[in-house]
Amino acid sequence: MSASSDFYRLTHKKFLYNITHIDNIPSIIQNGIMSFDDIKHMSHHSIAMNDVQLRRDSVLIPGGDRLHSYANLYFAFHNPMLYKRQNIAEDLCILAFSCDVLDIKNCVVSDRNAAASLAKFYSAEEGIRNLDFDKIFAQFWIHDDPYEQSNHKAIKCAEILVPHCIPYDYVVAACVVSQNAEQRLRNAGFDREVSINAKVFYR
């Protein structure tokens, strides 16, 4: 059984997600979602936090390459990264990718934010059987115990990592916060289904 079919069997979910700036859409249409290393010399509007990128720069994937040489998606779009960027919601879109991405050669998954000190990395096939999807897809990650909250926050950001690039062909749909954002997305050339849902962006 493939990693994507295992994922659907265990979660009944079909999509994986990337949160990006609408200005990046023309590049994504042409080049796909690219790794940090592959895109750093190109014009790109990053929404990543500098301290997070510094941590990611030092992470090595066991048996693989640098974390920054992998393009990444999330299992859950409703996560701490989106929460932290709610102030620029009008500039963001959430891209939904087919879970078939999990079947791309050398795909790796992390059981939490890949830059977290406790992160474990697995092949896609093995990882799907080891991730805590109850916590990944939980609506909230706030806990009375600070350690449990920190741990759950990292788990919410479990990642799918693909060497270098995830082609645009895997993109199925997008979600934005408003009609204005939808128009910007269309003007950027996006040609897939678009939904508008302000609540997704904590509005």
Which residue stretches match the model-derived regions?
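Active-site-proximal loop/hinge segments that shape catalytic or ion-binding/gating pockets
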Residues: 1-72, 78-203
